[in-house]
């Protein structure tokens, strides 16, 4: 592993079943870039994989502004039944960080969409880097996977490391995230 330090594995009992967890720390980051993999003990040669970027507001607080928390819940439920892993990347706010994400949220509250808000505070629509996920896939020896995503950038990034078959991820829209999902589809090319 060129850029990563790897932790021990530990058990993680959840509402969806028993998982294992393992942490990957980017070397030289002083612990600020630690990524988590949540996986079933014995996944197949063609596992179900969810590449999920951290979303504190959606994953932990249940925000209805995005579809992140729902996507993570669906992924964990499916993976517990079908076998596979969630690669949980610490790339809050599509890579802009929590502080900047809250500032972008404030602009969204004023009527700007998610892309406009990011651009107004000096960022691209998506600042994430998925190369770390490729190294994690290599660590587990994954050469073929069923990727649970609607994001074509994730598919393209992981095809550099493994054979990818996309499986769509259906998260219900609500009154708070309907516009956000439309922007993801129309401006970001998500396969919704």
Swiss-Prot record:
Major enzyme class: hydrolase
Keyword Nuclease included in the entry's annotation: no
Molecular function via GO: GTP binding; GTP cyclohydrolase II activity; zinc ion binding
Transit peptide listed as a keyword: no
Keywords from the named record: GTP-binding, Hydrolase, Metal-binding, Nucleotide-binding, Riboflavin biosynthesis, Zinc
Reactions listed under catalytic activity: GTP + 4 H2O = 2,5-diamino-6-hydroxy-4-(5-phosphoribosylamino)-pyrimidine + formate + 2 phosphate + 3 H(+)
Record note on cofactor: Binds 1 zinc ion per subunit.
Residues that bind GTP: 50-54, 92-94, 114, 149, 154
CDD domains noted in UniProt: GTP_cyclohydro2 (cd00641)
GO biological process, one term: riboflavin biosynthetic process
Pathway assignment: Cofactor biosynthesis; riboflavin biosynthesis; 5-amino-6-(D-ribitylamino)uracil from GTP: step 1/4
Documented EC number(s): 3.5.4.25
Cited InterPro entries: GTP_cyclohydro_II, RibA, RibA-like_sf
Necessary cofactors: Zn(2+)
Function: Catalyzes the conversion of GTP to 2,5-diamino-6-ribosylamino-4(3H)-pyrimidinone 5'-phosphate (DARP), formate and pyrophosphate.
Database matches in PANTHER family: 3,4-DIHYDROXY-2-BUTANONE 4-PHOSPHATE SYNTHASE, GTP CYCLOHYDROLASE II-RELATED
Family, per entry: Belongs to the GTP cyclohydrolase II family.
Protein name: GTP cyclohydrolase-2
UniProt organism field: Helicobacter pylori (strain Shi470)
Protein's gene: ribA
């Amino acid at each position: 592993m060129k850029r990563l330090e790897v932790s021990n594995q530990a058990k993680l009992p959840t509402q969806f079943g028993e998982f294992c967890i393992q942490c990957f720390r980017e070397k030289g980051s002083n612990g600020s870039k630690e990524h988590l993999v949540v996986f079933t003990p014995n996944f197949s040669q063609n596992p179900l994989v969810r590449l999920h970027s951290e979303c504190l507001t959606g994953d932990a607080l249940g925000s209805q502004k995005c579809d992140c928390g729902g996507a993570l819940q669906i992924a964990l439920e499916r993976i517990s039944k079908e076998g596979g892993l969630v690669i949980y990347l610490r790339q809050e706010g599509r890579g802009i960080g929590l502080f900047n994400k809250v500032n972008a949220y404030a602009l969204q509250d004023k009527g700007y969409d998610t892309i406009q808000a990011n651009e107004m505070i000096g960022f691209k629509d998506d600042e994430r880097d998925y190369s770390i996920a490729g190294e994690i896939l290599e660590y587990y020896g994954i050469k073929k996977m069923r990727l649970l995503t609607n994001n074509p950038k994730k598919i393209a990034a992981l095809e550099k490391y493994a054979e990818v078959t996309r499986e769509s991820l259906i998260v219900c829209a609500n009154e708070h995230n309907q516009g956000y999902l439309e922007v993801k589809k129309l401006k970001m090319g998500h396969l919704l």
